[in-house]
Amino acid sequence: MTDVTVKSLAAEIQTPVDRLVQQFADAGIDKTAVDSVTQQEKETLLAHLNRDRGAAPNKLTLQRKTRSTLNIPSTGGKSKSVQIEVRKKRTYVQRDPQAQEQAEAEEQARREAEELAQHQVQRDAEEKAKRAAEDKAKREAAEQAKRVAAESDKLTNQQTNTMTKSPQATEKARREAEAAELRRKAEEETRRKVEEKARQVAEEARRMAEERGGNWDNAPEPAEEDTTDYHVNTSHHAREAEDENDRKVEGDRRSRTRGGKATKQKKTSRLSESKADREEARAVGRGGKGKRRPSTLTQGFNKPAQAVNRDVVIGETITVAELANKMAVKGSQVIKAMMKLGAMATINQVIDQETAQLVAEEMGHKVILRRENELEESVMSDRDTGSSAAAESRAPVVTIMGHVDHGKTSLLDYIRSTKVAAGEAGGITQHIGAYHVETDNGMITFLDTPGHAAFTAMRARGAQATDIVVLVVAADDGVMPQTIEAIQHAKAAKVPVVVAVNKIDKPEADPDRVKNELTQYGVIPEEWGGESQFVHVSAKSGAGIDELLDAILLQAEVLELKAIRNGMASGVVIESFLDKGRGPVATVLVREGTLNRGDIVLCGFEYGRVRAMRDEVGRDVASAGPSIPVEILGLSGVPAAGDEATVVRDEKKAREVALYRQGKFREVKLARQQKSKLENMFANMTEGEVSELNIVLKSDVQGSAEAISDALEKLSNDEVKVKIVGSGVGGITETDATLAAASNAILLGFNVRADASARRVIEAENLDLRYYSVIYDLIDEVKQAMSGMLAPEYKQEIIGLAEVRNVFRSPKFGAIAGCMVTEGVVKRHNKIRVLRENVVIYEGELESLRRFKDDVNEVRNGMECGIGVKNYNDVRSGDVIEVFETIEIQRTIA
């Protein structure tokens, strides 16, 4: 037969040559690719491969995953599904026959060692007992010898020796009993220790055998020559292991459901527990009193015995429901707490910060007050305002005020027309309310505000936009009410006043009279020892204009006005309007910094990016420094006069701040317009509703106000009540007008007048405003107003009588009474009464009145007529028809 080489054998069995060479080497045969292979070598290689393939694995690891869904209840009564994955890993080890033989040999050696140790212990115990017996015999012999010697030596003391011997024998017997008991206890302790040690060794050996053998102890080992059943045996063992694992897991689950860990411990450690221990474990597993323990799926925590104190964050306003949610309590508990504090509220009602703080602290929580304008503060703080050390001198901002027709407008027009360059004359029509004038000594910015209302609003908002007030007083007219109001506003703002005595060119001018009158209000000239400069000017001829400008600049130099030119700009809105082509336009007077085109401006409720800037003559400018008025375009809406304009970094944050301001303004407005409370509603639901005449009273002095209030309240009666909504001393302000509009009241001014802002509100709301200088005139007009609110009286007046002479029948009107007018006049469609024997039997309306077949409107005394009574046909001859009319009598208050 041809020799088979390793290479040809590899090609025949379709395996690489290198692998076949390696397999020969593993079988102990050294071959190369060109060496020949004999039949015996082939059989040797096949036997080697069969042994390798037929060897079952000693260890098998099974990993199983179990997925399930658990529904967990959450807040709000809803449940949440949670995906749960349980991973189990079991490792099964097959016992090695050699290891089993070795373990059996070790077990045999251990048992022999235990038997040897037990025999040794028994021998030691026997020897110890033998030595104890010998010692006992020796002691007894010695005692006997002593006893004999004592009897022979002391015959005289036999009785005494006998008495002494008895307790010695008793003590000897007691000692022997104690020694025997100790020997018995020692033997029992030794035997118990040996048995315990043997039991522990046996238990450890059994546990090790179970770990080594696992569940494969009884599995038949595969035959050495059987290589085809390898996968079948492996899968069979795996299935058995999985089934056993499933049974074990199911048993654990059932044991947990029935009794928890105590039951499981009872089952697993039954071999090592006594019967009493098992009974005790069974009692514990059933709850101690024979009751079934609850399922482990129930909640393992109890309701807290103490209330949980929380940190409650409260803003400026909060609803009752939100407050209850933050304290983790029900809304009804919060309402109960508020009722205990004396406040009634619903669950959706908005309460203020103080009330919410009291309620939260009453319920034992810690309150953290939060300012809702934190964003606004952060936006304002994140601004580059420049260094205060780099402050430079700036132009003064001058507001010209004065009474109507005192030449204020003419003075402004003259200054503007003479100081504005000729090339800029065409831009005068672009009047924006503010402009600056260049003089030889410096620049001055004038504010042309419409009256003093805008000036007051600016001072109230702390704009600090006005530095100097020029008070214009006509030399021929003197001090007037608006002049006094201007002085009061200037003093309230702590702004210096420069007095311009206008119309000095008139023949009737009297400058000294103006000085005397102004002195009464605290404006004292410098030549009289005061601080106010007085300049005589004429807006018509231009006399004294330069002196006025010099006085303004001198006052500004004394004030040392400075501003930071670098950094983000801030200013105040002088006026604003809506232009059709350009949108919202605002006139801004820059106070600090530099306003550039493209800056983001936050202005009151509005915001936006500056798209264009123009000066007072309509020219486009790229930037504006301090004390320069400019028109800006690009805001989201028309801002209010007096609002502060601020340049910020982030347009998004500017929008949020503007929206927050709008929301707060809306809340305040709605709160002011809130309807009457429940108590007022019940108070108004009384029988015979009493009319109320609401009055807002302003007087010049407090005594007059009290006297008028008492006199008006005494005019009240059962039908009309006079209610003084508000009273005070001083002029009628915008607040008074707003109060009168809200309460539907009449404004009464006693020796006082309303200012411009109040007049605007009065005109807009169409309020009733009356001025008085005599208290009696005021009381009489209030009486007339109350009389108009009284219910009128009605009186029936008889205007005619007609006697029925005959009765006719008409197909159209029924019974027609032929009558003779005996008194007065009978008129058609008037009310009538039918009297029979001076008793009223019917009251109705006269429907038809005829004379000689002609319809007439009236029939006078002594004439005959036919009368048809509406809806009444029982008219008889001899009846009297009484014609009357109802007259309304206007009531008056005495």
From Swiss-Prot:
UniProt xrefs under InterPro entries: DNA-bd_dom_put_sf, EF-G-like_DII, EFTu-like_2, IF2_assoc_dom_bac, IF2_II, IF2_N, P-loop_NTPase, Small_GTP-bd
Boundaries of every tr-type G domain copy: 393-562
Keywords tagged on the record: Cytoplasm, GTP-binding, Initiation factor, Nucleotide-binding, Protein biosynthesis
Composition-biased stretches (Polar residues): 68-82, 155-168
Renumbered residue ranges of the record's region G5: 538-540
Source taxon at top rank: Bacteria
Localization (cell): Cytoplasm
GO molecular function: GTP binding; GTPase activity; guanosine tetraphosphate binding; translation initiation factor activity
Task performed by this protein: One of the essential components for the initiation of protein synthesis. Protects formylmethionyl-tRNA from spontaneous hydrolysis and promotes its binding to the 30S ribosomal subunits. Also involved in the hydrolysis of GTP during the formation of the 70S ribosomal complex.
Family: Belongs to the TRAFAC class translation factor GTPase superfamily. Classic translation factor GTPase family. IF-2 subfamily.
Identification of the protein by name: Translation initiation factor IF-2
Source species: Sodalis glossinidius (strain morsitans)
Lineage of origin: Bacteria, Pseudomonadati, Pseudomonadota, Gammaproteobacteria, Enterobacterales
